[in-house]
């Protein structure tokens, strides 16, 4: 999707901010409502941002104070009326604002934020310097028209609440200037392009909003508590989350609006219809009161309802800017509450001008008053109240969604804080470990350098001794001319020895470097070999354990086999002895048999022996095990003994 081009100039009617306002440089001198701004106020609504002061607030008696900067948001209406509203912001909130803007506009370059500095240092000079830096930084930031119109800046400055307070001041001025006491509706002041502006909720820490009136008193948010200075606020009044206060206030107003609209709808459907006279209507309007104020003036019901319907229509316009859809029902909530209060107040505080023959309805409302309406206006009022009821229900649902989203964001923030703490601990541990490793490496290098210096010192000492010997020999050669040749030869030899020593020194130094490099390489190789040996040692230990386990299992099996073989041999020995005994007995029986015995007995013996052989052969063919065969043979022999 093609991105829209940035706006060309300010007050072009395309600002998505509440009331279609645009940023303007702050005026140099403040003169209350009649302050002169550096532009033509007839071009539209304008706002400016200044940071006039800072304050120190503490959460408890024993805790350290927290620095809050007073951000003053001033608004000028097209009539030239200036209003101011202040909010408290911490330095971290400005840093978060810059981070949110960078995420929203990744291709845009931003002015650098003031440095954070030391957390514990909170001198007045440093805080005053930071206040000035923050004010200049905000001016540079808002000089960009695209940033000044962004949702992030509107949420940070709470322009929605500032616009509401400005509208209230303008309404108050209009009501004071009009003699008939008719107040201007909030919807008539809303810019056409910002009718559906989203209800922006601030999420910049524990900040507190204060509204500055003409007298300079500050009031916290929507509360009725008034203080002469925000520095004297208590903890509960100053550090309460403005989002939670806004949620509670909106939910209570939604519930009240729902109950009121439901009651009016039920009474509109069920109230009796009759004809009244003009005198009775005048008596009602004269004695009718609401919230302790008597009704005055005469109005036309048709004109009032038409005016309120148009006001409802203007409040239901939804803006098409991105990121405003989620909170569009919040504006409907505000519009519904304003329209409801304006309709009821205008109906109750006005008199009816009806004829004697008009059929009217009777409706009782809170405040011991009655509404007298023409019969044909009942359906219109019923539709208006149903629409307001639906808007209130939608607003209540959206408020519950906002509460759930706020709780979710709080949980995510706590999780990220814990994650950051863990990462900080891990970073400190890593730094300590790296520091220890570096110190150990430096110690090793220092030892090697010290050793090399000692070697160099020894070589220098030897060289110096040889030079002394050479000089002494040269001095002795001048005394004797006869030994000159020998001295010269000795000096040459000494020079040669010195050159050889120098060469040897160079060789030793070069060899030392080579040995050092080789030792490092050998150390690396040894480290790798040690690691491989450790791995192989572990593998060998595992294999040895496995071999020992297999050996023990094999020994157990071998022992079992030996026991089985011994049992088999013993059984065979017994069988063999039984067979010998049987054979001997058969021989004795054969010799004792007489020749005259009947042939039948011989045939029986031969049949028994044949049956025995057949049974043995059958068992061998079937492949029984030896133990079963021996048991069977014993059984057969027992049968033979019995026979």
UniProtKB/Swiss-Prot annotation:
UniProt-listed GO biological process terms: protein transport
Positions of region (Disordered): 1-26, 172-239
Lineage per the UniProt record: Eukaryota, Viridiplantae, Streptophyta, Embryophyta, Tracheophyta
PROSITE patterns cross-referenced by the UniProt entry: PX
SMART domains: PX
Membrane topology type: Peripheral membrane protein
Organism: Arabidopsis thaliana
Molecular functions per Gene Ontology: phosphatidylinositol binding
Domain PX: 47-164
UniProt feature, compositional bias: Acidic residues: 224-239
Stretches assigned to coiled coil: 389-440, 491-543
Name listed for the protein in its UniProt record: PX domain-containing protein EREL2
UniProt-listed PANTHER family: PX DOMAIN-CONTAINING PROTEIN EREL1-RELATED
Domain of life: Eukaryota
Primary location class: cytoplasm
Subcellular location: Cytoplasm, Cytosol; Endosome membrane
InterPro entries the record matches: EREX-like, PX_dom, PX_dom_sf
């Amino acid at each position: 999707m093609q991105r829209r081009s940035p706006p060309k100039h300010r007050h072009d009617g395309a600002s998505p901010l509440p009331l279609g306002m645009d940023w303007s440089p702050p005026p140099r001198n403040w003169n209350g409502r009649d302050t002169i701004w550096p532009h033509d106020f007839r071009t539209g609504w304008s706002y400016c941002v200044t940071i006039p002061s800072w304050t120190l607030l503490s959460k408890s008696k024993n805790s350290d104070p927290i620095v809050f900067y007073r951000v003053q948001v001033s608004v000028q209406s097209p009539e030239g009326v200036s209003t101011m509203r202040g909010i408290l912001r911490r330095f971290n909130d400005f840093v978060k604002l810059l981070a949110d803007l960078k995420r929203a506009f990744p291709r845009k370059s931003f002015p650098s934020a003031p440095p954070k500095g030391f957390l514990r240092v909170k001198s007045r000079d440093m805080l005053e310097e930071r206040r000035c830096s923050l004010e200049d930084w905000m001016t540079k930031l808002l000089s960009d028209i695209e940033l000044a119109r962004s949702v992030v800046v509107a949420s940070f400055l709470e322009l929605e609440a500032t616009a509401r307070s400005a509208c209230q001041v303008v309404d108050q001025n209009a009501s004071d200037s009009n003699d008939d006491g008719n107040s201007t509706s909030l919807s008539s002041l809303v810019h056409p392009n910002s009718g559906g502006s989203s209800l922006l909720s601030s999420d910049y820490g524990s900040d507190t909003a204060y509204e500055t009136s003409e007298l300079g008193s500050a009031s916290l948010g929507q509360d009725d508590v008034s203080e002469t200075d925000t520095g004297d606020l208590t903890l509960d009044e100053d550090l309460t989350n403005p989002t939670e206060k806004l949620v509670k206030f909106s939910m209570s107003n939604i519930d009240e609006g729902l109950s009121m609209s439901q009651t009016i709808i039920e009474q509109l459907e069920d109230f009796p219809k009759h004809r009244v006279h003009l005198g009775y209507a005048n008596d009602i309007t004269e004695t009718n009161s609401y919230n302790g104020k008597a009704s005055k003036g005469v109005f036309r019901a048709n004109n009032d309802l038409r005016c309120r319907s148009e006001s409802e229509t203007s409040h239901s316009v939804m803006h098409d800017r991105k990121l405003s859809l989620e909170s569009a029902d919040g504006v409907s909530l505000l519009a519904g509450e304003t329209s409801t209060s304006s309709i009821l107040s205008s109906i109750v505080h006005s008199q009816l001008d009806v004829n004697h023959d008009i059929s009217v309805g009777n409706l009782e409302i809170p405040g011991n008053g009655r509404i007298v309406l023409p019969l044909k206006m009942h359906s219109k009022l019923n539709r208006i109240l149903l629409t307001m009821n639906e808007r209130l229900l939608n607003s209540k649902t959206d408020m519950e969604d906002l509460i759930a989203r706020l709780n979710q964001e709080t949980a995510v923030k706590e999780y990220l804080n814990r994650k950051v703490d863990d990462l900080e601990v891990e970073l400190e541990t890593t730094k300590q470990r790296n520091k220890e490793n570096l110190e150990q490496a430096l110690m090793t290098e220092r030892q090697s350098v010290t050793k090399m210096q000692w070697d160099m010192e020894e070589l220098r000492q030897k060289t110096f001794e040889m030079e002394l010997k050479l000089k002494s020999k040269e001095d002795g050669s001048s005394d004797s001319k006869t030994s000159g040749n020998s001295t010269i030869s000795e000096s040459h030899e000494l020079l040669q020895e010195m050159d050889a020593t120098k060469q040897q020194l160079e060789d030793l130094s070069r060899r030392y470097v080579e040995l050092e490099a080789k030792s490092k390489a050998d150390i690396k190789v040894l480290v790798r070999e040690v690691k491989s040996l450790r791995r192989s040692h572990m593998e060998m230990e595992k294999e040895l354990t496995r071999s020992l386990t297999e050996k023990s299992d094999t020994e157990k099996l071998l022992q079992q086999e030996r026991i089985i073989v011994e049992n088999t041999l013993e059984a065979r020995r017994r069988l063999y002895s039984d067979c010998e005994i049987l054979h001997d007995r058969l021989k004795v029986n054969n010799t004792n048999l007489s020749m005259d015995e009947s042939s039948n007995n011989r045939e029986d013996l031969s049949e028994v022996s044949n049956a025995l052989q057949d049974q043995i052969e059958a068992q061998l063919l079937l492949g029984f095990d030896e133990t079963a065969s021996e048991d069977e043979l014993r059984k057969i022999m027992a049968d033979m003994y019995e026979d």
